[in-house]
């Protein structure tokens, strides 16, 4: 996907259409959040400009060699402890390593590796965050599950710790809509933006699945 066109561009179109068709005053909106495809990998520069098209979740299987490389590096038993299964094309770690191995010039320019929802949130607020589910599951084992901080020794063969977004809960406030984002989306400047999450999590909440056992 072209993140600037397909993700951010379409988000702006949808946001403006919703506001226009609903007649809701943007200043009355208490908070907004984005959901998007899950374990994507999008490298961006310091201005949050995409450095290449996003590598999508399981349907993009280009990182087969990197999965083999990581399995040999860590051992299948250790990987099973982390994931409960072998590595697969849905995991972000092999995608980052693929960029490092095959597009070193892009890797060198990368400020952050983002998912779809974290990219939209960054475009709205200027802050780089990822929700706990995506951070701990899709980027496993690069974050410590107890502290939510990147683990330097595990990141070292893959990426720098500072290339990863900050983990927050999906409903935590990530920041406020910037002046530029307000002009592009029609939202009011200063509107709170939550961290957001992946599509399946948001779909569950929207259908009323909010308690254990539902």
Predicted regions and their residues:
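N-terminal glycine/serine-rich phosphate-binding loop of ATP-dependent small-molecule kinases
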Residues: 1-53, 65, 81, 109, ...
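Short glycine/serine/threonine-rich phosphate/pyrophosphate-binding segments
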Residues: 36, 202-204
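Gly/Ser/Thr-rich active-site cleft segment
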Residues: 44, 79-200
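Short clusters of small/polar residues that mark proteolytic maturation junctions
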Residues: 55-56, 133
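Carbohydrate-associated surface elements
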Residues: 60
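Hinge/lid segment of periplasmic solute-binding proteins
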Residues: 64-75
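Alpha-helix C-terminal capping segments
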Residues: 206-212
């Amino acid at each position: 996907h072209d993140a600037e066109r397909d993700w951010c561009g379409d988000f702006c179109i949808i946001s403006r259409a919703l506001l226009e068709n609903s007649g809701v005053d943007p200043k009355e909106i208490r908070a907004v959040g984005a959901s998007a495809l899950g374990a994507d990998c999008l490298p961006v520069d310091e201005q949050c400009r995409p450095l290449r098209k996003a590598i999508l979740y399981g349907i993009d299987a280009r990182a087969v060699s990197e999965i083999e490389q990581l399995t040999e590096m860590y051992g299948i038993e250790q990987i099973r402890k982390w994931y409960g299964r072998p590595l697969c094309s849905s995991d972000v770690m092999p995608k980052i390593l693929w960029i490092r191995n095959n597009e070193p010039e892009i890797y060198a320019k990368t400020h952050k590796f983002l998912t779809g929802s974290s990219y939209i949130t960054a475009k709205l607020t200027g802050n780089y965050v990822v929700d706990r589910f995506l951070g701990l599951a899709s980027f496993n084992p690069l974050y410590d599950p107890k502290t939510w901080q990147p683990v330097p020794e595990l990141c070292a063969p893959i990426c720098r710790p500072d290339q990863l977004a900050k983990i927050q809960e999906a409903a935590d406030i990530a920041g406020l809509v910037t002046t530029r984002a307000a002009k592009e989306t029609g939202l009011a400047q200063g509107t709170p933006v939550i961290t957001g999450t992946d599509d399946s999590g948001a779909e569950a909440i929207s259908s009323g699945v909010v308690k254990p056992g539902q």
